[in-house]
């Protein structure tokens, strides 16, 4: 029998392309579980944190994407260790006795940031060294080319996936919830 899992749809916003030189500025997460009908479904719970900058790097282009300013993060962000302790505790509480599986839309970017920040904070990564990428999953499930796996195209192909709210895109918790819905649409499709 397969091990019970809880998927965690996670989205990261950052001040640049790599952690350590640049900052993870916000993180959103939404758990996904099997419902009583055996379908994958996002839970109503969510996690969101804005993180105080720990590194000097800030690319103008990256900062324009999510609209969080260095000044806002300096004043309102949570310290790195505290943010990662909060995420760890929340993840363990949501996963309970299941295995926590990291999911991202372009998971390598998001996982890289989260894994780095757990290590930087001196904490064990509750998601381990594995991640599920919804772009790759969409390629397989829908027989798509990589370039056709963006969220806009997937919203056209998956009738139950809502259109993106352009006012909320690049808010980490909005993106995490949207990705959770996308994950469920892909996982619940017939084989």
Briefly describe each language-model feature range.
Residues 30-33, 70-73, 123-127, 152-155:
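Short, surface-exposed linear patches
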Residues 50-73, 132-176:
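Active-site-proximal helix-loop-helix substrate-binding element of RNase H-like nuclease domains
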Residues 81, 85, 111-112, 132-135, ...:
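Non-catalytic, well-ordered alpha-helical scaffold segments
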Residues 2-108, 164, 170:
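Conserved non-catalytic scaffold segment of RNase H-like nuclease domains
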